[in-house]
Design a protein with these regions (language model features):
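Short Pro-Cys-Gly-centered "Cys-loop" motif that presents a nucleophilic cysteine in a tight turn
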Residues: 1-50, 59-226
Length: 226
């Protein structure tokens, strides 16, 4: 991870099995998410707990912050689940998947992508109807001690943020978010990807193995919010 650069991360249940059975399980996870995120210097901007996976939008202060957060939170929730349901073994599917996110249009798209998960899954008609995401905090102002608003969100403002949900996310952008997250790439313009590749010393977009060439790269024009 790159300190100060937002991350969209997803952690799935092992074999895509449920990792939350009821609201008590979800409340336990969220309580410790807030505590451990503070411990590991990760700012939580958005989240959504689905039945068999979790989405988080984070900004780590240190390179190891996200990995330590997921390791500690995953272990704690596994121990809790195994005790409560008298089971054994792993709960989660290996390492979490993630992408680096450029702090502009792409970041706000990830906010919405995360908070619209229950709508896409057909669980609710409106994101505000789902209790286990950050939508009510980010769009409606409900107090949530886990949430640290990103500067990009603050510059937009809550009312304008809420209006974004009146439009669908572009399907191509949805696919890009999924692909970059599953592939461990970077989500953003070409200049952002070059900076991330230089910092990490590895490729952060699809292509042949090895460090990407800087020759011929061009900055792409950012899509408009509205």
């Amino acid at each position: 991870m790159v300190p100060g650069v937002p991350v969209h991360a997803i952690q799935r249940g092992n074999n895509r099995a449920p990792c939350f059975v009821d609201d008590e399980d979800r409340a336990f996870f969220l309580h410790h998410l807030g505590r451990l995120a503070r411990d590991e210097s990760c700012a939580v901007h958005a989240y959504c707990l689905m039945t068999n996976h979790v989405h988080l939008l984070l900004t780590p202060e240190r390179e190891e912050s996200c990995a330590r957060l997921f390791k500690r939170l995953g272990l704690l929730h596994t121990q809790y689940t195994n005790r409560r349901y008298r089971r054994s073994g792993t709960l989660w599917e290996g390492r979490f998947r993630s992408c680096l996110v450029q702090s502009d249009y792409y970041l706000l798209a990830c906010y919405r992508y995360i908070e619209l998960n229950p709508v896409r899954a057909g669980m609710v008609a409106h994101p505000g109807d789902y209790l286990w995401s950050s939508y009510r905090s980010n769009a409606e102002g409900t107090m949530d001690p886990r949430i640290t608003p990103h500067a990009e969100y603050l510059s937009l403002g809550r009312d304008q943020y809420r209006l974004l949900f009146g439009r669908h996310i572009d399907p191509d952008l949805e696919r890009e978010i999924r692909a970059t997250t599953n592939g461990g790439y970077a989500l953003g313009a070409e200049a952002f990807k070059r900076r991330m590749a230089d910092f990490l010393g590895r490729r952060v977009s699809k292509g042949s193995p090895g460090r990407p060439s800087r020759a011929g790269s061009q900055e792409t024009m950012e899509p408009k919010l509205f």
